[in-house]
Amino acid sequence: MPEEKLRQKGIVLPEPPKPIGTYLPAVRSGNILFVSGMIPKIAGQPSSPKGKVGRDLTSQEGYDAARLCVLNALAAAKTELGGLDRISRVIKVVGYVASAEGFADQPLVINGASDLLVDVFGDKGKHARVSVGVAELPGNVPVEVEVTFEVKGSETGADIEADHVQENLLKEAEQKTSARRRSRGPYRKAAI
């Protein structure tokens, strides 16, 4: 049981992250749950050192940031599904590492995400994976991780309730985006 394994390890899931744009933290399609890219946040604030791995952070700090990204992904999955026990396996992890020039240990950094998933789900936590070095990530965070899960069963009352939560989050994000656009004033086209 994933939630029991987290408790045994003394790991408490953070509050599910709120979207910072017009998207949902997680979307279910049939028996597949797609979790949006998660950054290393606690209580809505980036928690790890910022910058590029290999310059501003060590590989170990990047590894720790990737673990926190997965904890946020698990929190989003739990909100969407009503519990982590509904996850039957981890399908894929995609990890983005803001990398200094010449840094080539992205797979070691994203092992932070993979290792935690295997610790929590055992063999069902083993997954396909992509580790990519990028120039920059939103908010100057060092790592972003997205996860795809296979889930058990059909939609339940918890799923329907989660849909309402997701709809409210999306409406809230759209309102914030619209308010930001209005506060910036009209955009002007440059003369060519």
What are the functions of these language-model segments?
Residues M1-I192:
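Short, polar/acidic, helix-capping and beta-turn segments at strand->helix junctions
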